């Protein structure tokens, strides 16, 4: 259901378990980021039996079809970031492209079991933004069942940049030893104290699964 008049205030009582938040997404980086930012703000209403639907994904469209043509298409990095964001947002993972035409790099994105596990986590909490959410830096945190936290570092700008991950806004202390795993690259990064720094390419995202040692 897509509504313009406080749809989120009455849809639960109508028996709906998920609802479209906005109009149609486009196959473009600008559209993906805009929709994701707006969906982040709707986090407090999401949860078990009440899922925010930012729209089906444009991963793999490559500029084809109506949505692809009006958007123009995205790079593989942009599609990867798109899938990562939807997983962090606990959004329905609806593929909008023809999977028969998938390239291996698209399959690698949409079949990432570690990201899907974050999306389907039993706690059912949507990611929230850590301060600050400005200057092209968007850092999201998603609490997971069992005490882990998933973090997403999104660089929406046109240039690569170093981004800082700080976990003291998530109930952990900066002096805690935190083990990080890059679930985008399926790679353990080791233990960290006092936060961590990451080089994030333009129009890209890194998702990390963290637990306190």
Spans of model-derived segments:
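Glycan-recognition surfaces
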Residues: 1-98
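C-terminal beta-strand-rich structural cap/linker in extracellular carbohydrate-active enzymes
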Residues: 190-213
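Generic recognition of flexible, low-complexity loop/linker segments
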Residues: 73-75, 136-141, 195-196
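Hydrophobic, well-ordered secondary-structure elements that form the walls
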Residues: 151, 180, 203
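Solvent-exposed beta-hairpin/edge-strand motifs
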Residues: 168-185
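Short, glycine-/Ser/Thr-/acidic-enriched flexible segments
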Residues: 64, 100, 123, 145-146, ...
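Carbohydrate-binding surface patches
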Residues: 86-89, 94-96, 133-172
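Catalytic cores of secreted or luminal carbohydrate-active enzymes
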Residues: 81-131
């Amino acid at each position: 259901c897509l509504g313009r008049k406080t749809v989120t205030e009455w849809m639960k009582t109508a028996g709906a378990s998920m609802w479209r938040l906005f109009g149609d997404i486009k196959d473009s980086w600008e559209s993906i980021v805009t929709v994701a930012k707006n969906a982040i703000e709707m986090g407090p209403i999401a949860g078990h039996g009440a899922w925010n639907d930012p729209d089906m994904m444009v991963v793999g469209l490559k500029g084809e079809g109506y949505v692809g043509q009006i958007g123009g298409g995205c790079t593989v990095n942009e599609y990867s970031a798109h899938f990562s964001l939807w997983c962090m947002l606990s959004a329905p993972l609806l593929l909008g492209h023809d999977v028969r035409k998938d390239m291996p790099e698209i399959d690698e994105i949409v079949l990432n079991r570690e990201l899907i596990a974050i999306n389907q986590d039993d706690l059912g909490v949507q990611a929230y933004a850590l301060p600050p959410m400005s200057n092209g830096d968007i850092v999201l945190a998603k609490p997971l069942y069992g005490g882990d936290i998933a973090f997403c570092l999104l660089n929406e700008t046109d240039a690569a940049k170093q981004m800082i991950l700080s976990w003291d806004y998530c109930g952990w202390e900066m002096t805690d030893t935190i083990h990080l795993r890059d679930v985008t690259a399926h790679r353990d990064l080791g233990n960290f104290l006092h936060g961590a720094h990451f080089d994030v390419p333009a129009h890209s995202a890194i998702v990390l699964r963290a637990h306190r040692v």
